[in-house]
């Protein structure tokens, strides 16, 4: 059986926060909240630094500056109706799980934002990982109604993890 989350650590500082455990916990909670079987899916989380995420942000979003988290869904899953939850993907089987996509998260930006917001960095990272996984599942915040849905979904998932409402 493949693990739900494959973690790639490009910046060793992520090991201090135990990114693999944070990523697995966030992904499992997100899928469970949406009634999706964790054993039917897989995703990749890369822990990197600001320089690497700025490079990726420039290449994929034409914004050559650091950001906190980026995600690349394996396929388009967004809902056609603003404010409506996207249709969940069909799970694979445990031996051949359905790939959801990739998430990258930047160490310095996460540390800085957590300090600015006066919250534990692990809570902030957990929030951003839930946010990234929701993007892989088709959630977005382009339209106001979609943003409201995504924030409410994040808040519900985070509450189940004991993380206070980030909004």
From Swiss-Prot:
Single strand-specific metallo-endoribonuclease involved in late-stage 70S ribosome quality control and in maturation of the 3' terminus of the 16S rRNA. It is found in: Cytoplasm. This is Endoribonuclease YbeY. GO terms for molecular function: metalloendopeptidase activity; RNA endonuclease activity; zinc ion binding. Its main location: cytoplasm. Residues 64-101 are annotated as: Disordered. Binds 1 zinc ion. Keywords: Cytoplasm, Endonuclease, Hydrolase, Metal-binding, Nuclease, Ribosome biogenesis, rRNA processing, Zinc. Residues 90-99 have a biased composition (Acidic residues). It comes from Cereibacter sphaeroides (strain ATCC 17023 / DSM 158 / JCM 6121 / CCUG 31486 / LMG 2827 / NBRC 12203 / NCIMB 8253 / ATH 2.4.1.). It comes from the Bacteria. One of its GO terms (biological process) is rRNA processing. Belongs to the endoribonuclease YbeY family. Its cofactor is Zn(2+). It is an enzyme of class 3 (hydrolase). One of its GO terms (cellular component) is cytoplasm. Its EC number is 3.1.-.-. Zn(2+) binds at residues 131, 135, 141. Signal peptide: none annotated.
